[in-house]
Amino acid sequence: MLKTLAILGAGRVGRALARLLHERGWRILVVAARSDATARKAAKYIRAGQPIAGISHHALAARTILVSVPDDAIPEIAAELARIGGQQLRGKIVLHTSGACEASVLQAVRAFGAFAASMHPLQTFNGVSVPPLEGKIFAIEGDAPAVRVARSIARSLGGIPVNIAAEKKPLYHAAGAFAAGLVLALEEAGVQMLKASGLSHREALHALLSLSRQVLEHYEKLGPHKAWTGPLSRGDYGVVAANEEAIARSHPEFLEAYQAVSRLSGHVLAADPAAVLGHLENLPRHSPLLSKSKGGSA
């Protein structure tokens, strides 16, 4: 298989994948971005590739074209690539790295005989350091020839390629959002509440990161039900009500999230979800708006 790549898009994911692939023997021929400056910066980061502004025929020199742009821009990029490449796309492999979109968003290049697939590494990219991808899941779906190349790329990076049904991509992506971005929001809300309790930012962050790591270790070793702790797991609904009242007074904007996550805990962690949810429904309700209007004295 010809290990030549054109990178369309200079975002965090595309840059990181290209650099890692370059280090593992793939030839990065082209790095395309919206502007010359961005393309040059990306090529410098990758340490390979001819920087190009916009989509051009130069990308057609590669056997595989990797589209790594915001989800909404993928069809536009595919259409432009189809316009420029036409019949020269026949037999090419075109991949995109979106977690939510299916390979079908690349239909414009499929129409000219290219093979398309989506390949999403389940990993966060901060744009500063290059994340290690060994042992990370790569969710892949699409045309068989493109899937084979995507699986080869994943294995080159030490990743674990897994097949996913196209129609399940949004659910797969939502699962990642649950475990990453939403957990981060809960962590930061907890830090803010600890700071309001009198801890410094450093103390609050250290306390909750230590707690969260321990919970995740227990989750991995013991499973969800045995790892579950806190007043709700013990059926201590008086403490849950006191928590809600404290949040309503101090951070009313967090109250609905606390209540929603409590219900979610009942659904997915409790041995008897109906009983837990019933108790939660019978707790005294605290209105975030009322608490805010009374200046936190509700």
Language-model features: where?
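NAD(P)+-binding Rossmann beta1-loop-alpha1 motif at the extreme N-terminus of oxidoreductases
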Residues: M1-H57
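Phosphate-coordination loops involved in phosphoryl transfer and adenosine-cofactor binding
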Residues: L2-T4, G91, G135
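Hydrophobic Val/Ile/Leu positions in short beta-strands of Rossmann-like dinucleotide-binding domains
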Residues: L5-I7, V67, I140
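Short, hydrophobic beta-strand segments that form beta-sheet elements in well-ordered domains
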Residues: L29-A33, V94-T97, F138-E141
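Rossmann-like NAD(P)(H) cofactor-binding subdomain of soluble oxidoreductases
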Residues: D36, Y45-I46, Q50-V130
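Internal alpha-helical scaffold of NAD(P)-dependent oxidoreductase catalytic cores
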Residues: A42-Y45, V109, G113, V130-K221
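Interdomain hinge/lid region at the active-site interface
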Residues: E217-A275
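NAD(P)-dependent dehydrogenase/reductase Rossmann-like domain
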Residues: H251, S265-L269, A274-A298
